[in-house]
């Protein structure tokens, strides 16, 4: 990592070739991606060299790992690609709240990237636990127990609030179905906080009883 690091160099100026990880490290990362995409849906990689790195170096390590996994996508209107999970007093339930800037217990939700990476530099004094659930399992349970609600959430879009991060000329919300399917895969676009906030926005299309019950 330090061999590839250049003082003052922006993250976007780095390339995968700047960080020639050992083959065993690359294999471990690729196995984690495969597990996340085609296995349990989540993978835990331990042993990152936190004690040997400064906070800036650890951020660069996170970026370097990402370069070996895919193409980074922005997380917010400010086009930040790496965000610190830190309580800065944000109200998670507000129309513009983001969970990573609050101390709230977050709802289960599915982020929009193909792979989401969370690295830990500082252990939280209290809390900070992560829970993982399966959108595929949720779909199977809903389709088995309430096929009417599963059908509603698969075929009729619900409003998703943009949490105040819409671009100029864009609506405050977008519309997506909670579930989508192909012949082999199930996709889940679940974020209850954004859906509930989206339902309250002016101009948002009304949802029917089945959609509302499915969300609840």
Task: Give the positions of each predicted feature.
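"Short basic amphipathic alpha-helical interaction patches in structured regions
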Residues: 56-63, 133-134
